[in-house]
C-alpha cells in the first residue's frame, strides 16, 4: 500500500489514485483474511427462516453502526458548502488530532465488553458492576487529563501536526478535546451498559435523536451562512450531551447499574485536571511565549507543561489514595520489578 501511494500519489490533487489504492487494499485485505479463515472454518448451512428471524436484529445493528454519520460526517457535509475551503480542513485536522489520541485509550473499554456479556449471561451482577467500575475508572483516569491538556495545548498541537498554516484550527482542536469529555462518558454508558444489556434498539434510537438534533442545529447554521468549523463542533457537542442525558435517565429508570462510582471518578479527575490551567500559564509566562510559532522555547514550554501537569495529577491522586491511581502504580511496579529481577 505504501509503495503504491508513493508511486501514484504525487500531488495534492491525486485524490482518485489515492481512493483507488485504499479501496483495492481494503478489498484485498478482506479477501485474504477470508481465504485464511476458510482453511480452518467451514461454511454452515443456515435455514432461510432463521436468517429472516435474525435479519431484524442485524438491521438494528446496521443502523447502530452507521448512526455516527449524523454527527461528525454530517458536520463535514455542511461545512463543504462554505465558500471558505479552509474550514473543512480545520475541522478534519482537528478531529484527526484528537481521535489519534483517544482511539488508543478506548481499548480499555472495548476489551471488557465480551467479559461483561459473559457475567450478565451468568447473572453475576457483582462481577459485572465491579468490572464496569474498574475499566471505566481506568479509562476516565487517562482520557480526562488528556482531554483537558489538549484543550489548553490545542493550538500548539495543531501547528505541530499540520504547520502554522492551520493555526486558526487551534480553537477547533480545543473544542474537539472538550467534546472528548462528553464522548468518553457516552462511550461508557452506551457500550458497557446499554449495549451489553441487549438494549441496542434503545441505544440506536438515542443516537438517531441526537443525530436529528445535530441535523437541525447544522441546518440553522447553514441558513444563517455560518460555516466556521468551531460552531459545528459545538452542535455535535450539544447533541451528544442530550444523548448522554437520555442514556443516564434510561439506566436509572431500569436500574441497569449504579452510576455513582462513574460520576464520582469523572468529577474527581476533572476537578484535579483543572489544575493544569495555572501550570500552563505559568510555563507560558516563564518561557515568554506570545505566539503559536513552534521554536525551541515553545517546545520546551510544551514539554514542561505536560511533565509538571502529569506530576501534579499523579501526586494529588496518590495523596488522596485514589483507587485507580494505586491500581496503576501496582501494575507499573510489578512490571518494572519483574524486569529488573530478570
Enumerate the language-model features and the residues they cover.
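Helix-loop junctions and terminal segments of transmembrane helices
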Residues: 94, 98, 102-136, 140-143, ...
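Helix-terminus/linker motif at the lipid-water interface of multi-pass membrane proteins
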Residues: 7-11, 69-101, 118-119, 155-165, ...
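Alpha-helical transmembrane segments of multi-pass membrane transport and lipid-handling proteins
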Residues: 3-6, 31, 129-185, 212-223, ...
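Helix-loop interface residues and adjacent transmembrane-helix termini in multi-pass membrane transporters
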Residues: 12, 82-85, 196-197, 223-227
Amino acid at each position: 500500500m505504501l509503495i503504491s501511494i508513493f508511486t501514484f500519489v504525487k500531488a495534492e490533487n491525486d485524490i482518485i489514485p489515492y481512493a483507488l489504492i485504499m479501496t483495492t487494499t481494503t478489498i484485498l485485505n478482506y479477501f485474504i483474511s477470508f481465504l485464511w479463515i476458510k482453511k480452518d472454518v467451514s461454511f454452515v448451512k443456515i435455514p432461510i427462516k432463521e436468517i429472516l428471524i435474525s435479519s431484524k436484529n442485524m438491521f438494528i445493528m446496521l443502523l447502530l453502526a452507521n448512526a455516527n454519520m449524523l454527527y461528525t460526517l454530517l458536520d463535514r457535509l455542511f461545512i463543504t458548502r462554505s465558500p471558505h475551503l479552509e474550514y473543512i480542513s480545520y475541522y478534519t485536522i482537528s478531529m484527526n488530532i484528537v481521535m489519534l489520541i483517544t482511539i488508543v485509550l478506548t481499548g480499555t473499554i472495548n476489551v471488557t465488553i465480551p467479559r461483561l456479556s459473559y457475567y450478565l449471561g451468568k447473572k453475576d451482577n457483582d462481577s459485572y458492576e465491579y468490572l464496569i467500575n474498574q475499566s471505566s475508572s481506568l479509562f476516565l483516569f487517562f482520557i480526562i487529563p488528556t482531554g483537558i491538556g489538549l484543550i489548553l495545548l490545542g493550538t500548539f498541537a495543531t501547528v505541530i501536526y499540520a504547520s502554522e498554516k492551520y493555526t486558526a484550527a487551534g480553537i477547533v482542536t480545543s473544542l474537539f478535546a472538550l467534546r472528548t469529555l462528553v464522548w468518553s462518558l457516552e462511550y461508557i454508558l452506551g457500550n458497557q451498559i446499554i449495549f451489553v444489556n441487549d438494549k441496542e434498539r434503545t441505544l440506536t434510537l438515542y443516537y438517531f435523536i441526537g443525530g436529528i438534533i445535530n441535523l437541525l442545529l447544522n441546518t440553522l447554521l447553514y441558513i444563517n451562512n455560518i460555516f466556521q468549523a468551531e460552531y459545528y463542533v459545538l452542535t455535535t457537542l450539544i447533541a451528544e450531551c442530550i444523548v448522554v442525558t437520555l442514556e443516564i435517565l434510561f439506566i436509572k429508570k431500569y436500574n441497569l447499574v449504579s452510576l455513582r462510582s462513574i460520576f464520582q471518578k469523572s468529577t474527581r479527575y476533572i476537578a484535579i485536571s483543572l489544575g493544569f490551567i495555572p501550570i500552563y500559564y505559568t510555563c507560558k509566562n516563564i518561557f515568554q511565549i506570545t505566539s503559536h510559532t513552534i521554536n525551541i522555547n515553545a517546545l520546551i514550554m510544551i514539554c514542561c507543561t505536560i511533565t509538571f501537569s502529569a506530576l501534579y495529577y499523579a501526586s494529588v491522586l496518590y495523596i488522596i489514595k485514589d483507587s485507580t491511581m494505586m491500581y496503576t502504580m501496582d501494575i507499573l511496579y510489578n512490571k518494572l520489578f519483574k524486569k529488573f529481577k530478570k
